Amino acid sequence: MIDLKLLRKDPQHFYEALKKRNYSTDIIDEIVNLDKEWRNQLNIVNNLKAKRNELSKLVARYKAEGKNQEAEEIIAESKKIGEEIAQYEGKQKELEEKMYNLALYIPNPPHESVPVGKDETENVEIRRWGEPRKFDFEPKAHWDLGPELGMLDFDRGSKLSGSRFTVMFGAIAKLERAIAQFMLDVHTKNGYIEVNVPHLVKRETITATGQLPKFSEELYTCERDDLFLIPTAEVSLAALHIDEILEENKLPKKYTAFTPCYRREAGSYGKDVRGLIRQHQFEKVELVWYTTPERSFEDLEQLTQDAERILQLLGLPYRVVTLCTGDLGFAAAKTYDIEVWLPSYNSYKEISSCSNVTDFQARRGNIRYRAKDGKLNYVHTLNGSGLAIGRTLVAIMENYQNPDGTITIPEVLRPYMGTDIIKPME
């Protein structure tokens, strides 16, 4: 959530931020107008309270002078003023709730280092690692490789659950498990604390992390219990410390979790709906940091490098791009996308988004830290995929495929697999 005090003080800052993101600024006008009305109510309340205080002094004087009847008349008048104050304060509370609810729809202002652009075509590439493999045969897409191996079954997934669900068998199922274990092992060696989190969360939890109310249509819900299936472990990890005060000397806190993720993906279309790229249910290893404002953008660089390290160890070519203002996620102040090379697309495809959310989630969740000087400040939260398991599986299948349809297993995964090659199921 944005800082409403800052909006009151400098609405122009938010006008400019929303324009950079290609958002309508009407919501800022609504809040500014509500704030004017709130201030007007506040002035009325303050004047009434001042009048009531004067009457209280008058009552004391009349009683001291023995003028009890006059004192009772003033007390009656003071009571009426108290009722008026309660009415105006009730209106103030209603206005505060309206402003708060509107503010939930305002995205995080982009950081000054984020390039201004209208959409993903204006994202800025900042580095590459590795070279795409030059095949001496016609490579196959994973949606052909997997069924030919007898290990990816899209038809049975559809039969069980509908479109964009998949059943995995044999070595491919084991490889997906191995990828997750490998990622967790690397991240925990790098100082992350592994966390096993709930996959169902309360409405206030998923509101705190920014998915609600704006993205309600993208979420799977359990209406009877008012619970939501997590679209990412970020939700559970970034809400772990709701209503808590952390100590600065214990920051940063670095968490990692492996969970299934559930997304309706209502707006997806085209080539992405084939295979494993855009599923309703997929697995992911998530990275989340709690840190201080002074170091959060420096920490974002480290978090991104931690995600990149997985691809380097797997020997998968990738590039890193900075998202422009028009492509930035709702809660993010700055985001790096890591894109892995996929032969089936003949291009790079997102496998991780690493973001600094600044204090956007912390304000919603009331997550603060006590600084060394004793002051309480909101933490900054960072998040990133470390990595998406399904897309990593796809990248391995396509980049490590052989002419005979077998798949060579990357060296770092062989201890987890107990073999160096995946052959068709018998």
From Swiss-Prot:
Catalytic activity: tRNA(Ser) + L-serine + ATP = L-seryl-tRNA(Ser) + AMP + diphosphate + H(+); tRNA(Sec) + L-serine + ATP = L-seryl-tRNA(Sec) + AMP + diphosphate + H(+)
Locations listed in the record: Cytoplasm
Record-linked CDD domains: SerRS_core
Gene Ontology terms: cellular component: cytoplasm
Domain remarks in the Swiss-Prot or TrEMBL record: Consists of two distinct domains, a catalytic core and a N-terminal extension that is involved in tRNA binding.
Family from the record: Belongs to the class-II aminoacyl-tRNA synthetase family. Type-1 seryl-tRNA synthetase subfamily.
Family annotation (InterPro entries): aa-tRNA-synt_IIb, aa-tRNA-synth_II, aa-tRNA-synth_II/BPL/LPL, Ser-tRNA-ligase_type_1, Ser-tRNA-synth_1_N, SerRS_1_N_sf, SerRS_core, tRNA-bd_arm
Job description of the protein: Catalyzes the attachment of serine to tRNA(Ser). Is also able to aminoacylate tRNA(Sec) with serine, to form the misacylated tRNA L-seryl-tRNA(Sec), which will be further converted into selenocysteinyl-tRNA(Sec).
Organism: Fervidobacterium nodosum (strain ATCC 35602 / DSM 5306 / Rt17-B1)
Pfam families in alphabetical order: Seryl_tRNA_N, tRNA-synt_2b
Binding site for L-serine: 232-234, 286, 385
Record's keyword terms, sorted: Aminoacyl-tRNA synthetase, ATP-binding, Cytoplasm, Ligase, Nucleotide-binding, Protein biosynthesis
Name of protein: Serine--tRNA ligase
GO molecular function, one term: serine-tRNA ligase activity
